[in-house]
């Protein structure tokens, strides 16, 4: 998942379990607890000084930041903005926008770049689609992004829950455009896509995250070719629904590797692109190995349009869901 997935340097708010403490798979694991059990060893690197162009906008005193938080809590909803420690949370909440994270706050994967907690997920909340729909209507949102944790424990990967959320949101807010940022539905792709056919979103997003050489390190459990196939197959079934994907830079990839992934995306009929700077959530996550200069981001953007992407949001603080409404509007989809 992706937005999710690109977070600022910060310490986890949860205290780590000591090695002697009994392992509880139902407990949400963050930071060191989460990454300690993955097969890839995280090797500390010299901490790079954050450049001047990495700047986070804080919420202003007259913003809707606390109003949004109160509404979310009242409706028992989770946002990826909070769970993934997104650096843009102050700006987005302040403007009355949020990316909703469904199916709980415990992911079945342990991606070491991501700050979303890992653990044995709770049963699906049957009231969540209705709570989500009412919240979106209450906030009077014109454009929403719905994402989720990975749910490898579910036979359909959570596809039916996505459909329930989309359909109930459309019942209460028929004019609202809905973008989904889905997991990879590993091992159940055809079933998930069959289910999504019943109520497809307005924009279908699935993040590639990084270059294939770094998949084993950054996305254990995921497969580069599978992620491309997911988006291509969805597009084949829904030719009028735009597809979208995102990449983060700073994990050790080269510029040419990023360009090659962009070419692969276009070869698999992906319409929209986001590229942003990876920022490590903690010292227990993958380290930042480079800060990409704004000139390089500009080059990626120019190349994206040459390749035929309908829209490319590229920059240090760009995230998959950041200004997603503006991205879709500029691409002519919203």
Swiss-Prot record:
Residue span(s) of domain Radical SAM core: 92-310
GO cellular component terms, A-Z: cytoplasm
Binding sites annotated in the UniProt record for [4Fe-4S] cluster 1: 81, 86, 92, 321
Name of encoding gene: lipA
Originating species: Cupriavidus taiwanensis (strain DSM 17343 / BCRC 17206 / CCUG 44338 / CIP 107171 / LMG 19424 / R1) (Ralstonia taiwanensis (strain LMG 19424))
Cystine pairs: none
CDD domains found in the cross-reference section: Radical_SAM
InterPro entries assigned: Aldolase_TIM, Elp3/MiaA/NifB-like_rSAM, LIAS_N, Lipoyl_synth, rSAM
Keywords attached to this entry: 4Fe-4S, Cytoplasm, Iron, Iron-sulfur, Metal-binding, S-adenosyl-L-methionine, Transferase
Name of this protein: Lipoyl synthase
Subcellular location per the Swiss-Prot or TrEMBL entry: Cytoplasm
Entry's EC annotation: 2.8.1.8
Cofactor annotation remark: Binds 2 [4Fe-4S] clusters per subunit. One cluster is coordinated with 3 cysteines and an exchangeable S-adenosyl-L-methionine.
């Amino acid at each position: 998942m992706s937005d999710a997935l690109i977070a600022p340097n910060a310490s986890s708010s949860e205290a780590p379990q000591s090695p002697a403490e009994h392992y509880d798979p139902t407990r949400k694991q963050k930071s060191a607890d989460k990454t300690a059990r993955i097969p890839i060893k995280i090797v500390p690197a010299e901490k790079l000084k954050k450049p001047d162009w990495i700047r986070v906008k804080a919420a202003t005193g007259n913003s809707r930041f606390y109003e949004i938080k109160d509404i979310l809590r009242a409706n028992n909803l989770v946002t990826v903005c909070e769970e993934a420690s997104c650096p843009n949370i102050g700006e987005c909440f302040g403007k009355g926008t949020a990316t909703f994270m469904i199916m709980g706050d415990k992911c079945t994967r342990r991606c070491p770049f991501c700050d979303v907690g890992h653990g044995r997920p709770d049963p699906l909340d049957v009231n969540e689609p209705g709570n989500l729909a009412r919240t979106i209507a209450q906030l009077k949102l014109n454009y929403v992004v719905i994402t989720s944790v990975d749910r490898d424990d579910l036979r359909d990967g959570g596809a039916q829950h996505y459909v329930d959320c989309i359909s109930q949101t459309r019942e209460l807010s028929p004019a609202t455009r809905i973008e989904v940022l889905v997991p990879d539905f590993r091992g159940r792709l055809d079933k998930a896509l069959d289910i999504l056919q019943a109520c497809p979103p307005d924009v279908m997003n699935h993040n590639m995250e990084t270059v294939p050489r770094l998949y084993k390190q950054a996305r254990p459990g995921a497969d580069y070719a599978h992620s491309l196939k997911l988006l291509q197959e969805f597009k084949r079934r829904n030719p009028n629904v735009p597809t979208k994907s995102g990449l983060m830079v700073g994990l050790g990839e080269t510029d040419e590797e990023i360009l090659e992934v962009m070419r692969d995306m276009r070869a698999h009929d992906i319409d929209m692109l986001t590229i942003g700077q990876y920022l490590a959530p903690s010292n227990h996550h993958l380290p930042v190995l480079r800060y990409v200069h704004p000139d390089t981001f500009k080059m990626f953007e120019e190349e994206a349009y040459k390749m035929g992407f309908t829209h490319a949001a590229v920059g240090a603080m760009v995230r998959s869901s950041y200004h997603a409404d503006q991205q879709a509007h500029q691409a002519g989809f919203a």
